[in-house]
Design a protein with these regions (language model features):
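Flexible glycine/proline-rich
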Residues: 9, 28-33, 37, 42, ...
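Helix-rich terminal scaffold detector
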Residues: 1-9, 177-302, 306-312
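Short, glycine/charged-enriched hinge/interface segments at domain edges or termini
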Residues: 2-3, 62-228, 373-374, 389, ...
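Residue-level signal for inorganic ion chemistry
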Residues: 15, 60, 151, 187, ...
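Generic structural signal for well-ordered, non-membrane alpha-helical segments
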Residues: 4, 8-12, 28, 32, ...
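Intrinsically disordered, low-complexity, positively charged segments
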Residues: 4-72
Length: 412
């Protein structure tokens, strides 16, 4: 490392800015029903007013409000019923003054009608109806365009489409939508000690947990993933990196980023001509992280320690990859909130420290009952069930139950 470690804020800003400058992914058109979780490639706008006509929000009678003047249970107004309208009907004629139209929820108001009286305030007559209440103009009417006006932007480009978006788009007659092609990420686990989970265990070896965990997290967010592993050999690492970069939009490695004799990733990036964005972050865990651009693609080199890799994946790699995938920046970032600790952490924090945790209902719980060993960067099992990181600022002492802390909730 030739430069001083940058702050977490600086590191995040650097990778987000770089991601925003990368070439946009080509769009693809897919069926609306398959679009949940995908990213809108362009603004999706309303093609029509919704609702497309003035309609009734209840079962009752469509009326001219002037005809209801003085109506009450003591002095009902009686009107002839000249038409009946259900949802899906199109009124053929206007409603004459001095007449009523029987109308059901969702049915269009006939021309001339300017209010609807609920049936509970009538005698529910079929030929004639007695009105027991007076109405004002426009009372009990759902107006054309009240929900969505024609031309309004339903989902700006970069929006992650939710079931609610799909419902509104379906109401506009969208059968297909243009979305960003999924970004493909190459996952490369480096280490001569690594085995695929399908291989028989051998002395001195460990199974590749990082690769599986990181790939699963990225797939959970909608990325396409290609996963590989290789030995601690700079030539092999270089070849694997080049191979993945020809097929993938970004590459994430784990292992080989510190200052050990077999930590070759800094040399590999230099050999390949990468432009470094981040050369170490002032935090624990994950300080040796590297981030770079190479051939117009993002490369993140994470620690081989499982929690260090998981933390920096959440803090830096995922936000940048989501931005490169076309998301709006605000939806790429871990949501920040303040929660109350239910248990403590006994160590002081000279530098910025991040602890895995579970947040729910304004409270946040550290795994291992606050036991410092549970938060070792090499501990993997304590990550199970966690949905956030607790941020402990540099210079903090031990944190105690009941203290309020900053929490970074994992991006969804």
């Amino acid at each position: 490392m030739n430069q001083p470690f940058c702050s977490p804020v600086q590191a995040l800003r650097s990778v987000l800015d770089a991601a925003a400058l990368l070439p946009s992914l080509s769009p693809e058109t897919i069926p609306l029903e398959a679009a949940c979780g995908r990213i809108a490639a362009a603004d999706l706008c309303a093609r029509m007013d919704q609702p497309p006509f003035d309609r009734s929000p209840l079962d009752g009678y469509a009326l001219h409000s002037a005809d209801t003047a003085g109506a009450s249970r003591e002095t009902p107004v009686t009107l002839p019923v000249v038409m009946k309208l259900y949802a899906g009907d199109a009124p053929a004629v206007a409603l004459p003054a001095g007449c009523a139209a029987r109308i059901m929820t969702g049915a269009p108001l006939p021309e001339g009608a300017d209010c609807v009286l609920m049936q509970e305030l009538t005698d529910s007559g079929e030929e004639t109806v007695q009105l027991y209440a007076a109405l004002k103009p426009l009372q009990n009417v759902v107006f054309r365009g009240e929900d969505v006006a024609a031309g309004a932007v339903i989902a700006p480009a970069g929006t992650v489409l939710t079931p609610a978006h799909l419902g509104v788009l379906a109401g506009q007659g969208y059968a297909e939508v243009a979305v960003c092609r999924p970004l493909t990420v190459g996952i490369l686990s480096t280490g001569s000690e690594l085995l695929e989970p399908s291989a028989p265990w051998a002395p001195g070896k460990i199974y590749d947990a990082n690769g599986i965990q990181n790939a699963a997290r990225l797939r959970q967010l909608g990325f396409a993933v290609e996963r590989q592993q290789c030995s601690d050999d700079p030539e092999v690492i270089t070849g694997k990196m080049q191979e993945l970069l020809t097929r993938c939009d970004a590459v994430i490695t784990s292992g080989g980023v510190s200052v050990g004799q077999k930590d070759y990733l800094p040399l590999v990036l230099e050999k390949l001509g990468a432009q470094l964005l981040v050369e170490g972050v002032a935090q624990k865990p994950g300080s040796p992280m590297l981030a770079a651009t190479l051939g117009g693609k993002l490369v993140f080199c994470l620690s081989g320690n499982p929690f260090a890799a998981a933390a920096t994946l959440e803090q830096y790699a995922i936000p940048a990859l989501l931005r490169a995938a076309g998301r709006r920046e605000e939806s790429c970032l871990p949501a920040r909130t303040v929660c109350t600790l239910t248990n403590g952490f006994s160590k002081p924090s000279k530098g910025n420290r991040y602890l895995r945790a579970t947040a729910c209902g304004g409270k946040v719980t550290l795994p291992g009952a606050g036991n410092a060993e549970a938060h070792s960067s090499g501990a993997l099992s304590a990550m199970m069930g966690c949905n956030c990181l607790v941020e402990i600022p540099a210079g903090s002492g031990p944190v105690e139950p009941g203290m309020e802390v900053e929490v970074l909730c994992f991006v969804q």
